[in-house]
Amino acid sequence: MRVTGLERKILVIVGDGMADRAVPELDGKTPLQAADTPNMDRLAREGSVGLLDPIRPGVRPGSDTAHLTLLGYDPFEVYPGRGPLEALGAGVEVRPGDVAFRCNFATAEERNGELVVVDRRAGRINEDEGTPKLAETINEEVDLPVEFEFKEAVGHRAVLVLRGGDLSADVTDADPKRVGKPVKDVKPTSDDPAAARTAEIVNEFVRKAYEVLKDHPVNRERERQGKPPANVILPRGAGQLEEVEPFSDRYGMSGAVVAGASLIKGIGRMLGMDVPEDEAITGRKDTDLKRKAELALEALDDHDLVLVNFNAVDEAGHDGDARGKVEMIERMDRELVGTLLEGIDPEETVVCLTADHSTPVAVGDHTADPVPVAIWTADARRDPVEEYDEISAARGCLGRFSGLHLLNVLRDLADRIEKFGA
C-alpha cells in the first residue's frame, strides 16, 4: 500500500504523429488498430484511457505547439515560432534580437528564370550523406550584410540564424510547401522597415546559397548516384525568442526531454529542462530506441518529469506510408515502451502514453483529430478499454479533454499539486 503524500515521478511517452484515420489499405483500420502493440495495450488495460485534443478541438497542432501544451504551456502565449526552437535544438545560440528560421535542404530546377522545387527534402538527405559539408560551405562562401549562422540538423532539416539589430520575424516563408512550385520570394508581413530588410536578406541568402550548392561536390556525387541534389535552402517559420518562465519555476519540478528531433530538444532547452544527448539517438528511423529508453530511465532517476519522443512514426505519416507507420508503431511498442515498462515501478511512477497530434497517411500532414491518451500508475482507475487506439480510447473514463490540462492531471496522480480551496 502506497503512503499518501509520497510524490511520484512522471514519464510522458510521445509517439509523434502516431494517431491517424481509417486507412483502406489496412481494411479500414488506423495504423494503431492494425499494429501489434502488447505494451501499449497493457497501459490501456491497466490504466485510464481517453481522448486528447492536443491544443483544442478543430486546431491543427504543430509538433512544437503540441509539445508546449503537453508540458503545461499555452502556445498562444509563449510560442516563439518554430525557427528558434529548431535552432536551440540543433545547438545554435539564439540571442535577443536574432531571427531564426527552420530550413529544408531541398532540390530545385531552373525553369524560365525561376527555381522550381522538385523535392522538398532532397531525397531525405541526412547528416551521413553530406549535409554538414554543405552547411560548412554556406557559412564560408555566402556573404550577407548581417552576421549569420547556418547549421544542419536532423535529416534534411537545417537552421538559419540572422544576428544583429534592425531585424524582424515578420516575414513570409521561402518554402512553397508543394513540389512543382517556385521558391517563394520572402516578403514582410508588417510595415516595420526591419521586416522589409529581413525579407531582402533572406532572399539574398537563398539565391547565394543556391549558387554555392548547385555544383558542390556532395551534390555532383548525389547526381552521379541518381539521387536528388540538395541544391536549395528553404527557410520558413521565422521567430524571435522571448523570455519564458522555466519549467522548474512554473511547476516546482525538475524536468528532462529525451529526443532526437532538434525541434523537441529545442522546446526542452527553451523551458530550461535538461536534454541528455547520445550519438545513438539520431531523430531518424535508425535511432536506437532501446538506448533512448535507457536514457529516459536514467533521467528519471534524478528528475521529477521526463518526456521521451519518437519522431519516425510521424515521418511515415507524412510520407503516406501506411505499412511503414504500422512498422514504426510496432517498433516503438517493442523497443521503447517495452523497455521503459521493464524499468518502471507503477507505485513510484505515473506513465502517460499519447501522441502530440494526428498525421493521417491519407493526408500527409497534421490534422485536428483527437489522439488517444493512456495514464498508468498503481492506483489508476481502470475502465473497460483493453486496447490502445483512437477508437477504443473514446470509451475510456478520462473522456475527451484539452492537452492544456494534461500536465495537471498527471501532477494530481503524482501528488504534486496543491488543493484548491479549504
Swiss-Prot record:
Biological process according to GO: glycolytic process
Molecular function as annotated in GO: metal ion binding; phosphoglycerate mutase activity
Superkingdom of the organism of origin: Archaea
Alphabetized InterPro entries for the sequence: Alkaline_phosphatase_core_sf, ApgAM_prokaryotes, Metalloenzyme, Pglycerate_mutase_ApgM, Pglycerate_mutase_ApgM_sf
SUPFAM superfamilies, per database record: Alkaline phosphatase-like (SSF53649)
UniProt EC number: 5.4.2.12
CDD domains assigned to the protein according to its UniProt record, in alphabetical order: iPGM_like
Pfam families associated with the record: Metalloenzyme (PF01676), PhosphMutase (PF10143)
Catalytic activity of the protein: (2R)-2-phosphoglycerate = (2R)-3-phosphoglycerate
Keyword Nuclease: no
Record region (Disordered): 173-194
Membrane-spanning parts: none
UniProt function note: Catalyzes the interconversion of 2-phosphoglycerate and 3-phosphoglycerate.
Record protein name field: 2,3-bisphosphoglycerate-independent phosphoglycerate mutase
Natural source organism: Methanopyrus kandleri (strain AV19 / DSM 6324 / JCM 9639 / NBRC 100938)
Taxon lineage: Archaea, Methanobacteriati, Methanobacteriota, Methanomada group, Methanopyri
